[in-house]
């Protein structure tokens, strides 16, 4: 009986593959938006429907793979690269599982997931802008700073999305301008949940699973000090950094990251330069304003490598960038508290006096703006999905037998991203 089941499994899978809708049969690819270590993100629209103008972002993940036959330089006798697929990345699994469950107006909406020819495609609603793009636009000398009403709306919406995540026992762990999308109607959408994780009942310590989280400029001080256990407060520190960047149009703590030794990946180096940038603005932390300071693994490194005692300088920094709103400064102080136990929570930040004073928070962050932000740069010199579709058709013609030669013939496709384009700042992790 078991033998018969095994024999009929192949034809069944083949029939299933023939009936499964492919990416290109459902969506028309307009071009690709960004590329990174995870794969690529494409702009697309539906085919053959009344809502053909509805736009989508298709995130195609690279498969975790490794090459074999190293004695032959990873190529077969015909010169084609030999690739063995080993599964789905942990970040892809996390993002798929979390996005399927989350439904909030300030979180990017997952529309569909398609598995096709060993590639995973996540279909999201499309957002025309992100905060990195908006900040970059306003950083041009001829353009005025971001209006206060726009900053207020953007930050409130970010906090609203973060509150929703935290209420559902999820922290994002990679909040930064490039991961904050904004729709054409001025609605914030927090994206890229690849590092997000549930924290109510973890099976192992958070540090064990991911030793390095949050992009360095937005990384909370407790993480820089090697915290093995941390709280959602790390997301609020990142929101504070984003608020400061919206006000000043440049990262407030722009340090240089010390890279992990490739020969000792278990050891994470102390990020001296990044911590230096923080103390220059916030002052040197002490046991008085951070009682648990000496409990962190990197406390000794902190004492030995950062010997200068800096006074608090955030108020002067705030004046230097031309800001004067006192409540906005108080909100910034609350988000950038050293002690995570004292730092503002997302729900408390939502009702901060800054958001209660005039001008009122607008649901549309672009309300009243007399400018239009440029649309995302779309790159059309890419045929990665097209190539994948051709492979899939070949796969089906052969009754499910994978044609390695056909697959490998597409490995030399030029998918380079113009990192120097002035209209769209490149990013490693973008929606």
UniProtKB/Swiss-Prot annotation:
CDD domains from the UniProt entry: STKc_CDK8_like (cd07842)
Protein function: Component of the srb8-11 complex. The srb8-11 complex is a regulatory module of the Mediator complex which is itself dependent transcription. The srb8-11 complex may be involved in the transcriptional repression of a subset of genes regulated by Mediator. It may inhibit the association of the Mediator complex with RNA polymerase II to form the holoenzyme complex. The srb8-11 complex phosphorylates the C-terminal domain (CTD) of the largest subunit of RNA polymerase II.
UniProt record similarity statement: Belongs to the protein kinase superfamily. CMGC Ser/Thr protein kinase family. CDC2/CDKX subfamily.
Species assigned in the record: Scheffersomyces stipitis (strain ATCC 58785 / CBS 6054 / NBRC 10063 / NRRL Y-11545) (Yeast)
Keywords, in A-Z order: Activator, ATP-binding, Kinase, Magnesium, Metal-binding, Nucleotide-binding, Nucleus, Repressor, Serine/threonine-protein kinase, Transcription, Transcription regulation, Transferase
InterPro entries in the cross-refs: CDK, Kinase-like_dom_sf, Prot_kinase_dom, Ser/Thr_kinase_AS
Subcellular location: Nucleus
Originating gene: SSN3
Gene3D superfamilies noted in UniProt: Phosphorylase Kinase, domain 1, Transferase(Phosphotransferase) domain 1
Primary location: nucleus
Chain ranges of the Protein kinase domain: 27-355
Residues reported to bind ATP: 33-41, 59
Record's protein name: Serine/threonine-protein kinase SSN3
Assembly information from the UniProt record: Component of the srb8-11 complex, a regulatory module of the Mediator complex.
Matching SMART domains: S_TKc
Stored SUPFAM superfamilies: Protein kinase-like (PK-like)
GO biological process, one term: negative regulation of transcription by RNA polymerase II
Stretches with biased composition (Low complexity): 407-424
């Amino acid at each position: 009986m078991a033998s018969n089941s095994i024999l009929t499994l192949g034809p069944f899978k083949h029939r299933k593959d023939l009936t499964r809708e492919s990416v290109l049969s459902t969506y028309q690819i307009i071009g690709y938006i960004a590329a990174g270590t995870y794969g690529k993100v494409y702009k697309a629209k539906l085919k053959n429907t009344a809502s053909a103008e509805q736009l989508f972002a298709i995130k195609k993940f690279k498969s975790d793979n490794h090459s074999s036959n190293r004695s032959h330089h990873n190529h077969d006798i015909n010169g084609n690269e030999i690739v063995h697929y080993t599964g789905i990345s942990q970040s892809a699994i996390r993002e798929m599982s979390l996005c399927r469950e989350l439904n909030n107006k300030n979180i990017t909406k997952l529309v569909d997931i398609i598995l096709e020819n060993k590639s995973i495609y996540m279909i999201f609603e499309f957002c025309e802008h992100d905060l990195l793009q908006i900040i970059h636009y306003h950083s041009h000398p001829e353009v005025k700073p971001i209006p206060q009403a726009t900053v207020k709306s953007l930050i409130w919406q970010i906090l609203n999305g973060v509150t929703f995540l935290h209420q559902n026992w999820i922290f994002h762990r990679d909040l930064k301008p490039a991961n904050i999308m904004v729709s054409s109607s001025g609605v914030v959408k927090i994206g890229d949940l690849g590092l997000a994780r549930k924290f109510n009942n973890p099976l192992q310590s958070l540090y064990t699973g991911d030793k390095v989280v949050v992009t360095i400029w937005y990384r909370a001080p407790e993480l820089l000090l090697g915290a093995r256990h941390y709280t959602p407060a790390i997301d609020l520190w990142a929101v504070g950094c984003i608020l400061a960047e919206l006000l000043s149009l440049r990262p407030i703590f722009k340090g240089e990251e010390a890279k992990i030794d490739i020969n000792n990946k278990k050891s994470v180096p102390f990020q001296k330069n990044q911590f230096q940038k923080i103390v220059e603005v916030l002052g040197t932390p002490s046991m008085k304003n951070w009682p648990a300071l000496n409990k962190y693994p990197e406390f000794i490194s902190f004492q030995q490598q950062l010997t200068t005692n800096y006074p608090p300088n955030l108020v002067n920094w705030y004046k230097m960038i031309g800001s004067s709103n006192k409540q906005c400064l108080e909100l910034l102080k609350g988000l950038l508290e050293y002690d995570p136990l004292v730092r503002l929570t997302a729900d408390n930040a939502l009702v901060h006096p800054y958001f209660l004073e005039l001008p009122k928070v607008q649901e549309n962050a672009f309300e009243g703006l007399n400018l239009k932000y440029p649309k995302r740069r779309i790159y059309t010199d890419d045929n990665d999905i097209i190539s994948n579709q051709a492979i899939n058709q070949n796969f089906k013609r052969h009754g499910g037998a994978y044609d390695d030669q056909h697959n490998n013939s597409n490995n030399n496709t030029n998918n380079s991203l113009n990192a120097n384009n002035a209209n769209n700042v490149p990013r490693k992790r973008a929606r």
